[in-house]
Amino acid sequence: SGKGGIPAVIRVGSETTFPPFEFTEDDKYVGFDLDLADAIIKQMGSKMEFKSMGFDALIPAVQSGQIDMIAAGLDATPERAKQVAFSDVYFKDNGYCIVVRKDNTTINDWADLAGKNVGAQVGTYQVKLAQEAKAAEVKQLDSNSQAWMELQANTLDAVVIDQPVAM
């Protein structure tokens, strides 16, 4: 244990296909959320131990004690707030967007997702948005990287994602 009952090491979990917040660069985990978590933990006099995991595993990992905190673009929904404590909001994004291939001519807004095959990362609010848009199938993918590959392979018509990540 560290000073004042603060652990010497704080275990941080994240899903690392969410640039610019969490991603892999030159075989290292980097990004805004990780830098912020590391700075806060250093200020506390502790060291950060990082664990990469699936987005849908983050809350269960905190609940089971595998990690101490989450550093990720995790929307503070009422359902999630019943399971874990949230910090103050430190980044407010401009919402969600639809990503399509360049050759797309039929999807221009949310209503156009009806009857289409749409991808979204498992465990995210975007899954709910795609379902509400009455997509024929909402494919829940393990990572944003997988979503981009499926979109390029033409197995998805669109991907719903946070706007900063899509940019």
Question: Where are the regions that the model predicts?
Answer:
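Alpha-to-beta junction loops
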Residues: 45-47, 63-72, 116-117, 136, ...
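Flexible hinge/capping segments at coil-to-helix
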Residues: 100-117
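A ligand-binding cleft/hinge motif common to bilobed small-molecule-binding domains
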Residues: 73-83, 129-132, 157-167
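Short Pro/Gly-enriched coil loops immediately N-terminal to beta-strands
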Residues: 84-97, 114
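Extracytoplasmic small-molecule ligand-binding "clamshell" domains
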Residues: 5-74
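Short secondary-structure boundary segments
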Residues: 16, 74-75, 102, 122, ...
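Short helix-initiation/N-cap motifs at beta->coil->alpha
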Residues: 34, 49-61, 105, 139-153, ...
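Ligand-binding cleft/hinge of the Venus flytrap
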Residues: 24, 37-46, 109-110, 123-143
